[in-house]
C-alpha cells in the first residue's frame, strides 16, 4: 500500500503538531509553517480550511491515505453511536497503532515496519497487515525469532508507563501485550477535532 514519502517535519510544521518524535525538536525551534512567509502568515481561516486541516492531522498521525481514510469514515457512519467517536475508535484499533501504543516502537511508522516484516503474532498467528482491526482480549507478541530485537527492547525501556494507555496491558519482560478493550473517545489524547472531519465529509 502507498505511503507518504515526503518530509514529515515540514508537514508537522504546517499542521502545527508533531507527527513523529523527530519532528518535536523542529516544532520547538520553528513553531510556524515552512516557507518564506510561514512565520508571518495571518488572516482569517475558512471553515473548509479548518476542516481540511483536521482531516490531514488524522491521516498523517495514523499514517493512512485518503481512500482508506474515507473507507474508515464510511464504516464509522454505518455503526451505531457518534460517527466521530466511531472513526477514532477504528483508527485506534489498527494493528500498527496498537503496536505503537504498547511501546513496541517509538512511532507508528516504526510499528508498521514491525508488522509488515512479519515480526508479530496475534493469538499465536502471524499477522502482517497494519490495518488489521484488533479486538478486545487479543494477544500481541513477537515471533520467537524476533524476540529481544535491540530496537524493540530500547523502545520499551524508553516508553514511560504513563504513555501506555489503560486499554492495553503490556508485559515488557516477555514483550507481549493484550488489547483489553476499545477505548472511549475521551481516553484518546490526540490533537485533532474529528467532528470537523465528519462535517467535511457530510457535505
Swiss-Prot record:
CDD domains: S4. The keyword Ribosomal protein applies. Part of the 30S ribosomal subunit. Contacts protein S5. The interaction surface between S4 and S5 is involved in control of translational fidelity. Belongs to the universal ribosomal protein uS4 family. NCBIfam families: PRK05327.1 (NF003717), rpsD_bact (TIGR01017). GO terms for molecular function: rRNA binding; structural constituent of ribosome. SUPFAM superfamilies: Alpha-L RNA-binding motif. It comes from Pelodictyon phaeoclathratiforme (strain DSM 5477 / BU-1). This is Small ribosomal subunit protein uS4. It comes from the Bacteria. One of the primary rRNA binding proteins, it binds directly to 16S rRNA where it nucleates assembly of the body of the 30S subunit. GO terms for biological process: ribosomal small subunit biogenesis; translation. GO terms for cellular component: small ribosomal subunit.
Amino acid at each position: 500500500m502507498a505511503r507518504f514519502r515526503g518530509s514529515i517535519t515540514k508537514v508537522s510544521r504546517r499542521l502545527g503538531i508533531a507527527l513523529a518524535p523527530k519532528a518535536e525538536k523542529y516544532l520547538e525551534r520553528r513553531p510556524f509553517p515552512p516557507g518564506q512567509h510561514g512565520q508571518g502568515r495571518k488572516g482569517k481561516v475558512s471553515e473548509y480550511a479548518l476542516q481540511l486541516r483536521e482531516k490531514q492531522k488524522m491521516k498523517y498521525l495514523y499514517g493512512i491515505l485518503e481512500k482508506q481514510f474515507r473507507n474508515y469514515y464510511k464504516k464509522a457512519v454505518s455503526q451505531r453511536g457518534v460517527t466521530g467517536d466511531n472513526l477514532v475508535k477504528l483508527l485506534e484499533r489498527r494493528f500498527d497503532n496498537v503496536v505503537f501504543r504498547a511501546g513496541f516502537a517509538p512511532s507508528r511508522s516504526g510499528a508498521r515496519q514491525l508488522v509488515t516484516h512479519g515480526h508479530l503474532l496475534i493469538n499465536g498467528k502471524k499477522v502482517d497487515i497494519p490495518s488489521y482491526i484488533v479486538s478486545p482480549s487479543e494477544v500481541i507478541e513477537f515471533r520467537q525469532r524476533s524476540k529481544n530485537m535491540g530496537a524493540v527492547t530500547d523502545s520499551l525501556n524508553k516508553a514511560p508507563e504513563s504513555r501506555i494507555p489503560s486499554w492495553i496491558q503490556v508485559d515488557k519482560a516477555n514483550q507481549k501485550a493484550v488489547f483489553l478493550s476499545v477505548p472511549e473517545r475521551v481516553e484518546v489524547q490526540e490533537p485533532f477535532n474529528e467532528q470537523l472531519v465528519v462535517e467535511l465529509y457530510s457535505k
